[in-house]
């Protein structure tokens, strides 16, 4: 009997060791499924004031995210608009070997395939652009009164002129007014919603938190002041000014530049120390605010430490030349390329040295369009010849 118990304990220990060394899979964020599928609203159209959530969408959210949706009616529609982040990702990488392809699954963590299991540059961009998308859409939704729990940003106060008109002091030539996009709400809610599940205990979780924060920072710091003049005969005696979000295309351009200059990182020595080395009790859970208090250092000691708006990654990217079903990589076979370019969209790089084929095709397009009063645009149909190069 004693031998039997020893055998059982040995087997259990072996299983525990195996489970401990097995890498975590499916690191992608489940909420991505909302943005992909599109949730029109979380208010019931039948009973006003009653919250409604599609069961399929309900399954993509964690408990905290469902609570945030209940407490802030209208946010799911704003989160769904983060689908622009997917379109922007595909726009930025349409001429690259990895073109940010997504899968038609509702379960969000599978949208980009299992490449998100890898701590590479592409994963860093995915996390940053989706976090930025939520921040951007929420800030705008507040201005449009689409969310019950937030409004325009009225934190700006009127300012007196620095150069008084006509020598009179305190003559206001411009003032804050209008309706500013509520970047404060968008930033805070994105932190609460997007970062749910990222406890900041492992290096990979710290990477995700850093890149999520970088995406939000790009939206926040690129806010622009817009003004409208008021006065007699076109004069600008008074200007009403407000803060406006940048276009999401400009956010995508900035993050793409950060992608090209992303930093490979590791934990700093202070973060590597165990609680026992610091004579502290090991916490059961990292406090919410403390999970952002970490320092990543460059993998190459000759490089500078990454800033708050830089993208960071942990490992080299996989190859994108050949199809890899396990990682969801489609490969570059059949991709269009530019035979005159020496850049990443050129046939030499895009086709990974396999060569390419050239086809001539005829397409029918609208041309010679003219405007006729009122109000019609008439076009002719032209048959044009196009030369298309595709990778072998």
Curated annotation (Swiss-Prot):
Residues 1-16 form the signal peptide. Glycans are attached at residues 99, 338, 368. Disulfide bonds join 89-100, 142-150, 152-179, 227-241, 229-236, 321-352, 337-347, 351-391, 367-382, 369-379, 374-375. Palmitoleoylated by porcupine. The lipid group functions as a sorting signal, targeting the ligand to polarized vesicles that transport WNT-1 to unique sites at the cell surface. Depalmitoleoylated by notum, leading to inhibit Wnt signaling pathway. It is found in: Secreted, Extracellular space, Extracellular matrix; Secreted. CDD domains: Wnt_Wnt1 (cd19333). GO terms for cellular component: extracellular space. Its main location: secreted. GO terms for biological process: canonical Wnt signaling pathway; cell fate commitment; neuron differentiation. InterPro entries: Wnt, Wnt_C, Wnt_CS. SMART domains: WNT1. Pfam families: wnt. GO terms for molecular function: cytokine activity; frizzled binding. Keywords: Developmental protein, Disulfide bond, Extracellular matrix, Glycoprotein, Lipoprotein, Secreted, Signal, Wnt signaling pathway. A lipid is attached at residue 233 (O-palmitoleoyl serine). Ligand for members of the frizzled family of seven transmembrane receptors. Probable developmental protein. Belongs to the Wnt family. This is Protein Wnt-1. The lineage of its organism: Eukaryota, Metazoa, Ecdysozoa, Arthropoda, Hexapoda.
């Amino acid at each position: 009997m004693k031998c039997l118990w020893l055998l059982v304990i040995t087997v259990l220990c072996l299983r525990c060791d195996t489970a401990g060394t097995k890498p975590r899979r499916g690191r992608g964020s489940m909420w991505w499924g909302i943005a992909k599928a599109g949730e029109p609203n979380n208010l019931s159209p039948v009973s006003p004031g009653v919250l409604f959530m599609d069961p399929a969408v309900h399954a993509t959210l964690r408990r905290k995210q469902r609570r945030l949706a209940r407490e802030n009616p209208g946010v799911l529609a704003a989160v769904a608009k983060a689908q622009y982040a997917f379109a922007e990702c595909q726009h930025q990488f349409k001429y690259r070997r990895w073109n940010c392809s997504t899968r038609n699954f509702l379960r969000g963590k599978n949208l980009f395939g299992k490449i998100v299991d890898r701590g590479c540059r592409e994963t860093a961009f995915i996390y940053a652009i989706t976090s930025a998308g939520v921040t951007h859409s929420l800030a705008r939704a507040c201005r449009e009164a689409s969310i019950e729990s937030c409004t325009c940003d009225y934190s700006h106060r009127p300012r007196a002129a620095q150069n008084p008109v006509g020598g009179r002091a305190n003559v206001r030539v411009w003032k804050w007014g209008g309706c500013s996009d509520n970047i404060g709400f968008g930033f805070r809610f994105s932190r609460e919603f997007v970062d749910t599940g990222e406890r900041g205990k492992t290096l990979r979780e710290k990477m995700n938190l850093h890149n999520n924060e970088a995406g939000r920072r790009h939206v926040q710091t690129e806010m622009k002041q817009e003004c409208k003049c008021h006065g007699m005969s076109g004069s600008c005696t008074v200007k009403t000014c407000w803060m406006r979000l940048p276009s999401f295309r400009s956010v995508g351009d900035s993050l793409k530049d950060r992608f090209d200059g992303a930093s490979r990182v590791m934990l700093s020595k202070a973060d590597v120390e165990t609680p026992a080395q610091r004579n502290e009790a090991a916490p059961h859970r990292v406090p919410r605010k403390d999970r952002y208090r970490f320092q990543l250092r460059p993998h190459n000691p000759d490089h500078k430490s990454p800033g708050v708006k830089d993208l960071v990654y942990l490992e080299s990217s996989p190859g994108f030349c050949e199809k890899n079903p396990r990682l969801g990589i489609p490969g570059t076979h059949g991709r269009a390329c530019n035979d005159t370019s020496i850049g990443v969209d050129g046939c030499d790089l895009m086709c990974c040295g396999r060569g390419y084929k050239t086809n001539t095709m005829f397409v029918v397009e609208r041309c010679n369009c003219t405007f006729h009063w009122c109000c019609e645009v008439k076009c002719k149909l032209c048959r044009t010849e196009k030369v298309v190069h595709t990778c072998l």
